[in-house]
Amino acid sequence: MAQVQGKIVQCIGAVVDVEFPRDRMPKVYDALKLEGSPLTLEVQQQLGDGVVRTIALGSSDGLKRGLMVTNTGNPITVPVGKATLGRIMDVLGNPIDERGPVDQSLTASIHRKAPAYDELSPSQELLETGIKVIDLVCPFAKGGKVGLFGGAGVGKTVNMMELINNIAKAHSGLSVFAGVGERTREGNDFYHEMADSGVVNLENLGESKVAMVYGQMNEPPGNRLRVALTGLTIAESFRDEGRDVLFFVDNIYRYTLAGTEVSALLGRMPSAVGYQPTLAEEMGRLQERITSTKVGSITSIQAVYVPADDLTDPSPATTFAHLDSTVVLSRDIAALGIYPAVDPLDSTSRQLDPQVVGEEHYQVARQVQGTLQRYKELRDIIAILGMDELAPEDKLVVARARKIQRFLSQPFHVAEVFTGSPGKYVPLSETIRGFKMIVAGECDHLPEQAFYMVGTIDEAFEKAKKVA
């Protein structure tokens, strides 16, 4: 069948209206190619009278009325499979790493249905991260979905990098990293970090363990809206080959924001706080595809920017519903100099259940949270009356809570260059043993500074000797 041609009748920024013969209009989500240009347009609406409204996936500079456009008859397709490993691609699957073309022999559409209900396979297996606070109070599930929530500058990307460092390097499977509307510098840093650690094999790209898809801050909204789907399509193809895949998204909020921009450009009526009326549906369509089947698993770790530190904002609130574990980063904890700045009282996990993690882990985690909660309640009294007015048992709770708070900090491998402290990976068994000793009162004689920025409890005892 011959490809149908149309012509541009209107350009408003990233929105381009194209007129086709009335009986051969493109379908919604069809990809249109501009003649004599690499620009791709994606159909978003059919306006009637043969006119379709499209979003430009690239710069619309130089477009004018009357230019000819060809309908490809298919949605956007991107390369998938082994050819993507070790490569950096844009939203359309074009290489942006100056290492030659990507093999297009295996491609897939970025728009596809989520797996059927009977194909799904929930997992109870824990994924150890080596980060104490996460392993203790909000453990991750293999094949689960994790969100890192935080405002500006509290450490989402650093935490994401450490998780990649601890999990992706030890993980024998493959990883896919989707950079959605974040800083180009961070994407560049990530690539070099992966190359230095051997996850990207520069000598033989096919031996690499990670595929990267970037649609950064400076890209048009159409690119930022679709780049998460491009990354997900690559991850799905690896999963359908029977592999266990790690899928990192930094930042899922920018996906929502790009949707808001596109929605406004298309002339839709905004809903709460100016977001698109289709926010829940767009988020659901993406998140329902990030799932594990009986063939293979996708474990997804997503950074979620929280506008103005407001967790009730519609964008983070919509994301919450889809996650198995939520890691909430707090500005108050970061202000105390405790990194990672994870709030152990706000962070939750579906896995923190005695039938999944075991009775000992569950009890220790709940005792730690109980001690910290009691300290939080006592802080107002301490601020007004001072420590001396507290009952002896409350003084003990405060002392233990401050030790727990400091013991929840940990030096990161990816931050070694800034802190000068070597990074620490703490096994889950050591994490449980350490916190169990603190809540049982076995460390009451140690000064609280001995617990700051150490790995295991044994290191805290060593540090206490030096402090003394």
Curated annotation (Swiss-Prot):
Topology in the lipid bilayer: Peripheral membrane protein
Keywords tagged on the record: ATP synthesis, ATP-binding, Cell inner membrane, Cell membrane, CF(1), Hydrogen ion transport, Ion transport, Membrane, Nucleotide-binding, Translocase, Transport
Localization of this protein: Cell inner membrane
Reactions listed under catalytic activity: ATP + H2O + 4 H(+)(in) = ADP + phosphate + 5 H(+)(out)
GO cellular component terms listed in the entry, alphabetical order: plasma membrane; proton-transporting ATP synthase complex
Pfam families, per the entry: ATP-synt_ab, ATP-synt_ab_N, ATP-synt_VA_C
Broad EC category: translocase
Cited InterPro entries: AAA+_ATPase, ATP-synt_VA_C, ATP_synth_F1_bsu, ATPase_a/bsu_AS, ATPase_alpha/beta_chains, ATPase_F1/V1/A1_a/bsu_N, ATPase_F1/V1/A1_a/bsu_N_sf, ATPase_F1/V1/A1_a/bsu_nucl-bd
EC number(s) given by UniProt: 7.1.2.2
GO molecular function: ATP binding; ATP hydrolysis activity; proton-transporting ATP synthase activity, rotational mechanism
Stored CDD domains: ATP-synt_F1_beta_C, ATP-synt_F1_beta_N, F1-ATPase_beta_CD
Binding-site list for ATP: 150-157
Alphabetized SUPFAM superfamilies for the sequence: C-terminal domain of alpha and beta subunits of F1 ATP synthase, N-terminal domain of alpha and beta subunits of F1 ATP synthase, P-loop containing nucleoside triphosphate hydrolases
Family: Belongs to the ATPase alpha/beta chains family.
Cited function: Produces ATP from ADP in the presence of a proton gradient across the membrane. The catalytic sites are hosted primarily by the beta subunits.
Subunit record text: F-type ATPases have 2 components, CF(1) - the catalytic core - and CF(0) - the membrane proton channel. CF(1) has five subunits: alpha(3), beta(3), gamma(1), delta(1), epsilon(1). CF(0) has three main subunits: a(1), b(2) and c(9-12). The alpha and beta chains form an alternating ring which encloses part of the gamma chain. CF(1) is attached to CF(0) by a central stalk formed by the gamma and epsilon chains, while a peripheral stalk is formed by the delta and b chains.
Protein name: ATP synthase subunit beta
Origin species: Acidovorax sp. (strain JS42)
Classification lineage: Bacteria, Pseudomonadati, Pseudomonadota, Betaproteobacteria, Burkholderiales
